């Protein structure tokens, strides 16, 4: 199913040594690379889908894999809002059953903590054995985790299931985002990475539908149905894995030119295009090697890579700081505490996920037109205002204010997914240098999950009625962190929309200031005499 690590006689044979690719083909490779870059810029979204339908299809598969991660993440938070789950695993407190804060923290924190390990491990493993085999190993872990969650009757067994399921969750995200960044044509790259975020709304949407139908039951199937349904979602993904072509970028980097050619052919490129694409990949990797040698995690922090690492990692960390963990995990529980019936809160959960999906779909049409920087920056401004108003209404505490808080949390889901919820994944896959993309993605996701782990342990003690009982007033904390995040974005976030990896390499090596990225004329543009506006940059 995968590829071994033994280099073969390369395609073409004269460039078998991957460290001498650029030298062996010389100016010919560079000319082909620049020409293909210009062709990519001229291609529209619909042309890319029509000419490379299989590349588009396998990007969709990588997006589908992300549904597994969002499904399990949402299931862990949603079960807290199911009365029967609190009864089976919790204790009686002031007229209702409450899950102990320590176990609530453990259920939320354990899978996020193991996802950190999964993300970092996947970055290393994916570079050693390939993207496809890393997927395969992750599927084994996810099935074990689902089984333990389903059969559990004690907090300890359920905790074990959540812990094990966290490892593939981290791995799936790392590999999927890396694979999309490597396989998607330039015209589709922004849309596909933004569309990847919709997977993080589809999973919760499915969970909400299941809970709406079964959550009011008075037996264990009120919550077990959620986990059983995961078998279908995961099983379908595992079935299609056997047909997935390996990443041509990974194959070229390993010196497997013939296999890279076959992979590109399976992705929909004809014979002429295959040779051109291999030249582009080889040129890009060779130019990166001129700047640095090795592909260790430490390399992410050296020379121009450090700046790229920070810019790649920061948006995902900002996601974890701006309150999405609280909104995604505690909205249903908060609605019940605020006086809504379980059935009403389950219906509101469906509305929440529909708004999240609509927000992400909206981002597809804005991410290239508005640009990554603009959409992220102004989105954070809106989220900051929403969080501060939400906290203020929670302080008021009147019935009308409580309803207003619930409404604002729904609006938050839409705005978040239009902006930082979508752009963070585009920036992660686009900004990282080619040879370090998997490791950069691993670090970004590990840091994000570390922050989520912190919130998982802290929020129950701030939020729960038997603890600090802050409720939605925790929005003030996230609002303050959002202010700091917005300031960072204003000064340090560059615009990368419409830029090829070759152009980004050039601009980072030249240390172009962040706010000058949009207007900078690259050597590729100069050589082809194409103005910046002709390259499809965001206006």
Language-model segments: residues:
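Alpha-helical transmembrane bundle of multi-pass membrane proteins
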Residues: 2-269, 286-539
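Short, well-structured alpha-helical segments
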Residues: 271-286
